[in-house]
Every structure is written in structure tokens, then in C-alpha cells.
């Protein structure tokens, strides 16, 4: 009997190990690079063969040529500078206010009762729908665009910070209080470090939201910016320049996300241990 059990358990372990390799298998980085190159070559081929009109889908080589021309003319530089200014200010303001709101509502029962229902009620509203109202209140200048970005950033940061604070082990807080730690010391040494993973998850969500709101705001209420540039060439049906603007926007989002990942590794070095 023991031998049969041993054989059965060994067979079961072998089956589980084989199934787990499907989930745990890793591939070298060149696989990702090769897949992108193959996709671009296929895209170039169907455009060169005339299967798709360049008006609807320009070839990658045509888009790169348009991008280089726009870079040389300074058109991309001016638009990118305006967009970076708006997204950085909006993201910083929204993140700081969201972080403060999440910490306060997460640590104060009264603030939780007052603030949490308001945040949950306002969160589902599409923020871009409020842009005309902000333009009416704040004018068509930079303030309305920065404010709508800050508002979009505020909610994911506030809600994730709140969840991170609520998920902190109460035993750790009790230990800090038993050693006569002040409220600020408890927040700094116990609550904030344990809530950081959730806070950074909120920041990453907010980064995507801020980019979407930036483009929408620039398309509606801006003369300069990547969103305004894309809309301009869309109206003129100059597709290669439109796609060049989309590529710049994609690279901006990628760099923003990489920066947040780097910042997270610096702030939470123990996360990947």
C-alpha cells in the first residue's frame, strides 16, 4: 500500500509540475522584439502592395518619415512641451490631494463617514464631461485643462490610498501606539510604508487616466499640444502626421509608466525580494 501511495503521489506531482510550466514558463526578451518587427514588416508589406490605402493606414516607413519631418520643423517639440507641462502639473496636484484625502479618510472614522460616500458617488462620472463646465468656470486657458487632469488623477489615487491604509495590519498600529508613537510617527513608520504598494497601483492607474484626459482636453480646448496636433491632422486627413502624433503620445505614456515603475522600486525596495 505505501508503495502504491508513493507512486500515485509521484504521478500526481509530475502532472501538476507539467501543468504549472505553462504558467511559469519564461521566454527571452528577443521574442517580444521579434514579434514587433514581424508585425511592422507585415504592416509595411500590405501597405506597399496597395491592399490598404495610405489615407486609411500609412506604412510605418511613411509615418517615420513624417515624424522626422515634424521633429526637424520643431512642430513636435512645441506640442510635446505644452502637453508635458499640463500633464505634470495636473498629475502632481491630483496625486497630492488624492494622497492626502486617502490618508485622512483611511485613518479618521469621521472623515471616512463624510468623505467616502462623496468620493464613491462622484467617481463614476466621466471626467471629460465636466470639461465644458470647467471652461465656463475657469476659462479656456491652462487652468481648466490642468484642473480636469487633476480631477481625473485624484480619484484613483484617493481610493487606492484609502484601501491601502485600511488594509494595514491593525496589530502593527497597536504596537506603535503601545510604544507611545505619535500620530505622525505612526503614519510615517507604519501606515504609509505598508500602504505604498496600493498607492503606487493608484498612481499607475492615474497615469493612464491623465493621458486620456490630456488628449481629450487638448482636442476640445487647446491650440497647441499633442491632442490638438492629432485633431488638426485628422481634420486635414493627413494620416501619416496624425499617426506620428499618436506614436509620440504612446512614447510619452510609456516613459511616464517606466518612471513610475522606477520610482516604485526606489520607494518599495522590499516588494520584489
What do these predicted ranges mean?
Residues 17-25, 49-92:
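Periplasmic/extracellular loop-to-transmembrane helix junction in inner-membrane transport proteins
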Residues 89-119:
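Transmembrane-helix boundary motif in ABC transporter permease subunits
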Residues 125, 165-171, 175-195, 235:
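Short helix-to-coil transition segments within interhelical loops
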Residues 1-37, 258-273:
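Transmembrane alpha-helical segments of polytopic membrane transport and secretion proteins
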Residues 136, 165, 212-249, 270-273:
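Glycine-rich helix-loop "coupling/hinge" segments at transmembrane-helix boundaries
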Residues 109, 197, 201, 243-273:
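C-terminal transmembrane helix and the adjacent membrane-cytosol boundary/short C-terminal tail
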Residues 120-156, 163-164:
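Generic hydrophobic transmembrane alpha-helix motif, especially the helices
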Residues 147, 151, 184-216, 244, ...:
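Transmembrane alpha-helices
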Amino acid at each position: 500500500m505505501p508503495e502504491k501511495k508513493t507512486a500515485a503521489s509521484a504521478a500526481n506531482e509530475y502532472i501538476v509540475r507539467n501543468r504549472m510550466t505553462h504558467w511559469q514558463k519564461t521566454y527571452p526578451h528577443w521574442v517580444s522584439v521579434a514579434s514587433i518587427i514581424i508585425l511592422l514588416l507585415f504592416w509595411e508589406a500590405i501597405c506597399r502592395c496597395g491592399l490598404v490605402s495610405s489615407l486609411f493606414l500609412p506604412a510605418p516607413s511613411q509615418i517615420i518619415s513624417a515624424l522626422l519631418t515634424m521633429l526637424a520643423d520643431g512642430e513636435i517639440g512645441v506640442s510635446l512641451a505644452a502637453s508635458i507641462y499640463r500633464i505634470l502639473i495636473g498629475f502632481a496636484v491630483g496625486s497630492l490631494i488624492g494622497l492626502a484625502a486617502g490618508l485622512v479618510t483611511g485613518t479618521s472614522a469621521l472623515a471616512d463617514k463624510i468623505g467616502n460616500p462623496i468620493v464613491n458617488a462622484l467617481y463614476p462620472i466621466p471626467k471629460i464631461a465636466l470639461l465644458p463646465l470647467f471652461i465656463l468656470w475657469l476659462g479656456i486657458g491652462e487652468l481648466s485643462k490642468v484642473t480636469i487632469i487633476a480631477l481625473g488623477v485624484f480619484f484613483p489615487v484617493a481610493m487606492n490610498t484609502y484601501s491601502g491604509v485600511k488594509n494595514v495590519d491593525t496589530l502593527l498600529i497597536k504596537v506603535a501606539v503601545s510604544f507611545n508613537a505619535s500620530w505622525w510617527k505612526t503614519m510615517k513608520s507604519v501606515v504609509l510604508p505598508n500602504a505604498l504598494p496600493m498607492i503606487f497601483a493608484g498612481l499607475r492607474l492615474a497615469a493612464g487616466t491623465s493621458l486620456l484626459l490630456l488628449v481629450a482636453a487638448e482636442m476640445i480646448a487647446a491650440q497647441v499640444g499633442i491632442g490638438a496636433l492629432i485633431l488638426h491632422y485628422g481634420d486635414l486627413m493627413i494620416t501619416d502626421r496624425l499617426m506620428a502624433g499618436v506614436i509620440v503620445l504612446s512614447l510619452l505614456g510609456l516613459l511616464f509608466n517606466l518612471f513610475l515603475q522606477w520610482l516604485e522600486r526606489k520607494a518599495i525596495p522590499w516588494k520584489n525580494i
